[in-house]
């Protein structure tokens, strides 16, 4: 999944870079471009809202309280274990870096 986010980030930066380096347009073209950008933005917000509503509806349909409790319990146990092992690793690393003093 990290590659997808990186690809999206690169594409967004590329588009923004091209926009910054683009030639200056006459005033009339800027107004047309602005309205096109506004339409595109409104369209994207509409799609985002639709996807968000569909995801919320799907979540509400499949919500199981027992599963939610199990997930919370697993999360709590795993974070406790990770924090314990991270503490042990940190102590070992610090003792290696300090050496015999």
Swiss-Prot record:
Isomerase is among the record's keywords: no
Region (Lipid binding) location: 66-74
Keyword Secreted: yes
Entry PTM: Proapolipoprotein C-II is synthesized as a sialic acid containing glycoprotein which is subsequently desialylated prior to its proteolytic processing. Proapolipoprotein C-II, the major form found in plasma undergoes proteolytic cleavage of its N-terminal hexapeptide to generate apolipoprotein C-II, which occurs as the minor form in plasma.
Keywords associated with the record: Chylomicron, Glycoprotein, HDL, LDL, Lipid degradation, Lipid metabolism, Lipid transport, Lipoprotein, Secreted, Sialic acid, Signal, Transport, VLDL
GO CC list: chylomicron; high-density lipoprotein particle; low-density lipoprotein particle; very-low-density lipoprotein particle
Gene Ontology annotations of biological process type: lipid catabolic process; lipid transport; positive regulation of phospholipid catabolic process
InterPro entries found in the cross-reference section: Apo-CII, ApoC-II_dom_sf
GO molecular function ontology, one term from the record: phospholipase activator activity
Signal sequence annotation: 1-22
UniProt subcellular location: Secreted
Region Lipoprotein lipase cofactor: start-end pairs: 78-101
Similarity comment: Belongs to the apolipoprotein C2 family.
Task of the protein: Component of chylomicrons, very low-density lipoproteins (VLDL), low-density lipoproteins (LDL), and high-density lipoproteins (HDL) in plasma. Plays an important role in lipoprotein metabolism as an activator of lipoprotein lipase. Both proapolipoprotein C-II and apolipoprotein C-II can activate lipoprotein lipase.
Protein name, entry field: Apolipoprotein C-II
Species name: Phoca vitulina
């Amino acid at each position: 999944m990290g590659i997808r986010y990186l690809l999206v980030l690169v594409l967004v930066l590329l588009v923004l870079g091209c926009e910054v380096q683009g030639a200056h347009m006459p005033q009339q073209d800027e107004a047309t471009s602005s309205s096109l950008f506004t339409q595109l933005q409104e369209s994207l917000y509409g799609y985002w809202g639709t996807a968000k509503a569909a995801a919320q509806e799907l979540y509400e349909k499949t919500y199981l309280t027992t599963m939610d409790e199990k997930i919370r319990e697993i999360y709590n146990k795993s974070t406790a274990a990770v924090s314990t092992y991270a503490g042990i690793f940190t102590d070992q690393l610090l003792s290696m870096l300090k050496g015999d003093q």
